[in-house]
Amino acid sequence: MKHIRNFSIIAHIDHGKSTLSDRLIQVCGGLSDREMAAQVLDSMDLERERGITIKSQSVTLNYTAKDGETYQLNFIDTPGHVDFAYEVSRSLAACEGALLVVDAGQGVEAQTLANCYTAIEMDLEVVPILNKIDLPAADPERVAEEIEEIVGIDAMEATRCSAKTGIGVDDVLENIVSAIPAPEGDPDAPLQALIIDSWFDNYLGVVSLVRIKNGSLKKNDKIKVMSTGQTWGVDRLGIFTPKQVDTDVLRTGEVGWVVCGIKDILGAPVGDTLTLAKNGSEKPLPGFKKVKPQVYAGLFPVSSDDYENFRDALGKLSLNDASLFYEPENSAALGFGFRCGFLGMLHMEIIQERLEREYDLDLITTAPTVVYEVEQTNGETMYVDSPAKLPAVNDIEEIREPISRCNILVPADYLGNVITLCVEKRGVQVDMVYHGNQVAITYDIPMAEVVLDFFDRLKSTSRGYASLDYNFQRFEASNMVRVDVLLNGDKVDALALITHKDQSQTRGRQLVEKMKEFIPRQMFDIAIQAAIGNHIIARSTVKQLRKNVIAKCYGGDVSRKKKLLKKQKEGKKRMKQIGNVELPQEAFLAILHVGKD
């Protein structure tokens, strides 16, 4: 056991986590040179295309140190985006230490801080590493000072390396062996294994990634899942090197995968504890705190025949992504679907893309909303995650919207632009600290504003230098209203949105103008209206197509023309009474773009 080292690699987006993982694998001989590919751990197509890590991946390597001993290194490569912070915290729970990778050119950024604090809270040993020292812009001295000043860990002795060229990678490995403590645990105690991650394999059923805290797990053992109480036989187990390799036993402190032939998606939830069916452990390990979704959106299959497949796909995906929440929902305009909860907009995009690719579905998404706390006149409090569930205006005492605490790190030159943006998003400044050339500002901004396009706008006003980390702070009373969209006087439930009273007029006007572009012209006028309650705040009309009925009159009496026009008008009126409007997919997406341009 004293030769095992478990650690995660944490860093801000694009500071070189996955590349460093590649080097570690290569140096330790986990893969032959032929099998080596750039970012070998980012195995999803989506990850490769976007160049980001979405899922944490674990690898077990053997490393012969300079003292002649062979160490087993279990490491987990983690994502860097705010939306996947939950993946990071789960990975950290399986480790004793973390490598904090910082780009020697960029310096400390917001996610570096957030992830580092998560690691420190879990009592992990944090080892700072300065990466990308081969860049002409690299300034390791300045960055080491920044780490000490902003993060507050000793960094003057930090290992310097370049993951791309391979300089200093040996020092990193030596550092891991010397600085990160060996796992604690009792090999003779009853088995306790923590499920860090699970995914669904069409042939094997549920595959779980586990960290053995106490005891050991062997092939053909009978195990019990503690939350459900079900027992299973272990069919196969092993480690990732990063390929799946079968072994016969997982010992205390090791990280590996287990297949028990579980076919039920809810059979082995993430954060659960496995123990032996006979003489097992009495109490489970402390799991992970459940994360609450921040953004909700309706997802509907384009053709209603796909509903069953869609439900299965969501189930399989939620096994793999523990932060996804879903419940059935039906809409008059879109039929049956699900209301899904996500951690942020990037998470939502990724989930939608994974559903469309991996499960071959066509989906319509409704506008994302956040959760509002509504106090009703009868004294009850309810939580509303969709505009359709908002009670009637007379029944509402007050609506409270979620406020998020945003920590932004930005170079001093762009401070003005960033503050202007925060104020425009109804933000309230909490704190501002200068660290050399970097400024750390803290704002309380309504979640609804952050979720929509705050991140994109922040990047563009600061030329990409600002970085953001946000988390939910509290609910605060606010003047929110629901804007309904009416087509020819009928409400379209899927198009409603909740917005602040001050912005309702502009949002309503932009929305109807945008919708007008997407709805095809019909044989009769289509009135698109935005309304708050019974009060119409904006309107635009898609004009009818009409035949020129008086073309055949050459000269002649005016009453003849009037008669023909009147007849046409009556026909149009009759048509309008029975005609209904088909909404194209683009019209639903129009809401997403309101206020962007």
Swiss-Prot record:
SUPFAM superfamilies in the cross-refs = EF-G C-terminal domain-like (SSF54980), P-loop containing nucleoside triphosphate hydrolases (SSF52540), Translation proteins (SSF50447)
Q: How does it sit in the membrane?
A: Peripheral membrane protein
The record's catalysed reaction(s) read: GTP + H2O = GDP + phosphate + H(+)
The EC number of this protein is: 3.6.5.n1
What are the BP-aspect GO terms?
A: positive regulation of translation
Answer yes or no on keyword Electron transport: no
Localization, UniProt = Cell inner membrane
What sequence ranges are listed for the domain tr-type G?
Answer: 2-184
Which residues are noted in the entry as GTP-binding?
A: D14, H15, G16, K17, S18, T19, N131, K132, I133, D134
Keywords, A to Z?
Cell inner membrane, Cell membrane, GTP-binding, Hydrolase, Membrane, Nucleotide-binding, Protein biosynthesis
Look up keyword Mitochondrion and say if it applies: no
The protein's superkingdom reads: Bacteria
> InterPro entries from the entry?
EF-4, EFG_III/V, EFG_V-like, EFTu-like_2, G_TR_CS, LepA_C_sf, LepA_CTD, LepA_IV
One GO MF term attached to the UniProt entry: GTPase activity
Major subcellular site? membrane
Give me the Gene Ontology terms describing cellular component: plasma membrane
User: What Pfam families is this protein classified in?
Assistant: EFG_C, GTP_EFTU, GTP_EFTU_D2, LepA_C
The enzyme class is: hydrolase
Fetch the CDD domains from UniProt.
EF4_II (cd03699), EF4_III (cd16260), LepA (cd01890), lepA_C (cd03709)
What this chain does, per the entry, is described as: Required for accurate and efficient protein synthesis under certain stress conditions. May act as a fidelity factor of the translation reaction, by catalyzing a one-codon backward translocation of tRNAs on improperly translocated ribosomes. Back-translocation proceeds from a post-translocation (POST) complex to a pre-translocation (PRE) complex, thus giving elongation factor G a second chance to translocate the tRNAs correctly. Binds to ribosomes in a GTP-dependent manner.
NCBIfam families named among the record's database cross-references: lepA, small_GTP
Give the UniProt family note: Belongs to the TRAFAC class translation factor GTPase superfamily. Classic translation factor GTPase family. LepA subfamily.
Specify the protein name.
Answer: Elongation factor 4
